[in-house]
């Protein structure tokens, strides 16, 4: 038995009697509590009760729009359309709304534990906040908690697991969290597309891919969790998430293209996770690399999946390009002189500047270089981390050097298409020096351009497979319970 300390409550009465259970069960069973807690029961296609629970410092933060609750219900149906029946007895989304805690999301067999900013629920529909962590952690019901790679889990909490196949555990999950968000309206198609544009651009500029494989980022995950203040493009991070997701997107596009959109990665997922749930707490149905290859081959046998995994996942890349992926989706990845994605449009007038795809670095509002790409035009001109740009020369300023601003720097890069250079005044360790960057490419913003006459598989991937439940404005779609004082 236990007692919640004075002034706090959880979803149970004040006295809590915890049943006898295995250590694995308790480790896998988080709990939230607080003075202000609300719960919504979601409409699930299975018999298992699904509840969305949220706790916040202020009661007014616990207003979840009916449309958002309906999208979460739709997410449950879309998930089962992809992965098969929900395998457990219940599920709870445990949400902590707090501005003072770091963001996190942690999957469990029958729940997930997520922290969001306090205003997230209230603004979720108005500001189109995707809340992608919700579908991401829910997908782990199947990817990681029903099936997981051989050697990842052990009978104790001391033996390190084999994490080389995290490109399945987290890569497949990361791919489908974007897909589920698009299919359920958590994101618009434009947001879905723009997210992939940003991911492709990111990895086209990541030189670490030339020496360190995706598999290797999984093997070294314990050392790569934290960001590095220097040369992260060479060091790499836990890229089995995002670059792993690009492999699964390519697999989806290959299958759709070869079968005239009659089959897809959804067919792989349904086959791969069609296993009997284990009865023992903490157990999973293990899979091997060969199991993945065999399941992909069963859906479409016209590709050497073993070789593709070796090339895309298990080996350093010979090139940083993604031309084949865009082409298979029915698009061309290109750069334009004007912002294309919503993110680039909103940041194009900002006080900081991301010029990684042009002169090769980012600067903050004070002009300090925060990241730089090795062998980029800026790098070749001698620029480096923490150097500070204090002056910029533009034609608009009459060829004189003006004080740094992100707008002036962007203008100088824009003019480089005619001038062939970008002239800066840089301060480093108390010393000022002029720097000329040899560059004539102008501003470059990434885009995905549809190719005439080719099927649009990106849009096909985002199409829902189940009907969306209604969310009338006069009553919640889902039963809501409140625990007032």
What annotation goes with each model-predicted range?
Residues 1-48, 60, 70, 74-77:
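Structured beta-strand-rich cores of soluble
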Residues 6, 10-30, 76, 82, ...:
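Carboxylate/His-rich catalytic cores and anion/metal-binding grooves
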Residues 16-18, 40, 114, 433-439:
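Generic detection of short hydrophobic beta-strand segments and adjacent strand-loop junctions
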Residues 39-166:
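Juxtacatalytic substrate-recognition/specificity segment
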Residues 62-65, 104, 124, 128, ...:
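Hydrophobic alpha-helical scaffolding
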Residues 112-117, 121, 146-147, 158-209:
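Post-HExxH zinc-binding segment in Zn-dependent metallohydrolases
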Residues 177, 187-485:
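C-terminal recognition in membrane/secretory proteostasis and scaffolding
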